[in-house]
């Protein structure tokens, strides 16, 4: 079981991390992983503490909290399971592969910001809504840390379509 310190995660008030994913849910997640053109071999289902990329093992652990909470209004809760997988794979895993131990601490606002930002811009086969929620999540991460982010052309395009 991964500790909070060693696991990068999406957080939020999604479905409970204690929910055991069913074989049908896992099959659906595997289709999303395939659509994202991600390496299925690094994903572990119903293992780990919660959904998140582990810098220590180089694996992405998937728990029940990968599933949306449609009763919420927060982008982190509303984003699809595919968007969550993109956050972990095209965000945390990508930057861990690129920078290794030179990354911000797991869970730091800038680590979470860039994971959602990079996934919103670069993950293949996401819907416009997925990209919008990922970008909105990136901005929420900065806001929660008290950091102002300039709205760039990329941010505006993803959020507003222009």
Q: Model-flagged regions — what are they?
A:
Residues 1-162:
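Catalytic toxin/effector domains delivered as secreted proteins or via bacterial secretion systems
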């Amino acid at each position: 079981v991964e500790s909070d310190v060693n696991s990068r995660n999406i957080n939020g008030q999604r479905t409970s991390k204690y929910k055991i994913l069913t074989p049908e849910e896992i099959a659906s997640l595997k289709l999303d992983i395939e659509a994202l053109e991600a390496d299925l071999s690094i994903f572990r289902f119903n293992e780990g503490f919660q959904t998140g990329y582990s810098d220590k093992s180089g694996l992405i652990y998937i728990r029940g909290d990968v599933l949306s909470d449609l009763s919420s209004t927060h982008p982190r809760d509303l984003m699809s399971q595919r968007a969550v997988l993109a956050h972990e794979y095209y965000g945390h895993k990508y930057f861990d592969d690129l920078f290794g131990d030179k990354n911000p601490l797991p869970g730091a606002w800038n680590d979470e910001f860039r994971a959602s930002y990079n996934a919103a811009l670069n993950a293949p086969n996401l819907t416009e809504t997925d990209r919008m929620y990922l970008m909105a999540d990136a901005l929420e991460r900065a806001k929660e840390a008290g950091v102002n982010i300039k709205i760039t052309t990329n941010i505006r395009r993803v959020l507003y379509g222009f």
